[in-house]
Amino acid sequence: MNSKIFAVLLLLGLLSCVLSDQYCPKSSITACKKMNIRNDCCKDDDCTGGSWCCATPCGNFCKYPTDRPGGKRAAGGKSCKTGYVYY
């Protein structure tokens, strides 16, 4: 009996981990001078250790996902370049 309860609780715990939504963290910066815009990444593959490429006003940076919405994932694309971006 105890093993069945444990199995059900374990399954519920795994399900909650799999089904929980993940987001880029919300940036605390609301504006950035054009000369300070830098992209460390253009897509998730540019990041390591399970981090995502997230967009901020100062460029794209690798961040670890969070369960709180508010951030924005980097769009990437052919026009995205890493390094300092001058418009």
Curated annotation (Swiss-Prot):
GO CC terms in record: extracellular region
InterPro entries (alphabetical): Elafin-like_sf
Coiled-coil stretches: none
Any one Gene Ontology molecular-function term assigned to this protein's record: toxin activity
Keyword tags: Antibiotic, Antimicrobial, Disulfide bond, Secreted, Signal, Toxin
Occurrences of domain WAP (ranges): 21-66
Main location: secreted
Places the protein is found: Secreted
Tissue note: Expressed by the venom gland.
Keyword Secreted in annotation: yes
Modification after translation (UniProt): Contains 5 disulfide bonds.
GO biological process: defense response to bacterium
Superkingdom of the source species: Eukaryota
Signal peptide limits: 1-20
Disulfide-linked positions: 24-54, 32-58, 41-53, 42-80, 47-62
Entry similarity comment: Belongs to the venom protein 11 family. 01 (wap-1) subfamily.
Function: Has antibacterial activity.
Name under which the protein is recorded: U15-lycotoxin-Ls1f
Organism: Lycosa singoriensis
